[in-house]
């Protein structure tokens, strides 16, 4: 899996070198990115991080568009310096001119959200539930109190959980 990714990164750099007729410093490539982002270019560290799940699920478009998108950020930074917009004219020039791709800012990959457990708290005055995150539930266990906005009574854990 990473071989194709590294090959595409190298291909993108070679296209840029051919287009601009100058060498560019190669980045470190990592598959340590989670969440909604498909890729991130760390300009000062010369590092590219890619999301392995989105890569697996969208390999063809990922290799074509996402890799070029992130490499274009590094190329733009090496060519034009710090004072450019992330998706500004310089980056767009590279996307269109070098890679002949549309300069899309965001991907359209289907991102699966992980399930989240909510801890149900209740107030003595109302029938309403207050779903707490794991972090907030832990804070309650450590002594933090949360009050009902209506009656100002302390919310109490019901013993119930819900997976969203």
UniProtKB/Swiss-Prot annotation:
PANTHER family: PROTEIN SPRT. One of its GO terms (cellular component) is cytoplasm. Residues 14-156 form the SprT-like domain. Its main location: cytoplasm. Belongs to the SprT family. It comes from the Bacteria. NCBIfam families: PRK04860.1 (NF003421). This is Protein SprT. One of its GO terms (molecular function) is zinc ion binding. HAMAP family: SprT. The active site is at 70. Binds 1 zinc ion. The keyword Cytoplasm applies.
């Amino acid at each position: 899996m990473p071989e194709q990714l590294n090959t595409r990164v190298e291909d993108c750099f070679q296209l840029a070198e051919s287009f601009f007729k100058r060498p560019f410093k190669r980045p470190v490539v990592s598959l340590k990115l989670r969440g909604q982002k498909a890729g991130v270019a760390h300009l000062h560290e010369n590092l590219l991080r890619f999301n392995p799940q989105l890569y697996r699920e969208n390999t063809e478009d990922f290799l074509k568009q996402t890799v070029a998108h992130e490499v274009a950020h590094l190329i733009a930074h090496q060519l034009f310096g710090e004072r450019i917009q992330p998706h500004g004219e310089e980056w767009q020039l590279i996307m269109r001119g070098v890679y002949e791709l549309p300069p899309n800012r965001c991907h359209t990959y289907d991102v699966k959200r992980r399930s989240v457990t909510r801890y149900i708290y209740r107030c003595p005055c109302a029938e309403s539930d207050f779903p707490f995150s794991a972090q907030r539930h832990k804070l309650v266990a450590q002594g933090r109190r949360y009050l009902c906005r209506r009656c100002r009574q302390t919310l109490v854990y019901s013993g119930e959980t819900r997976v969203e």
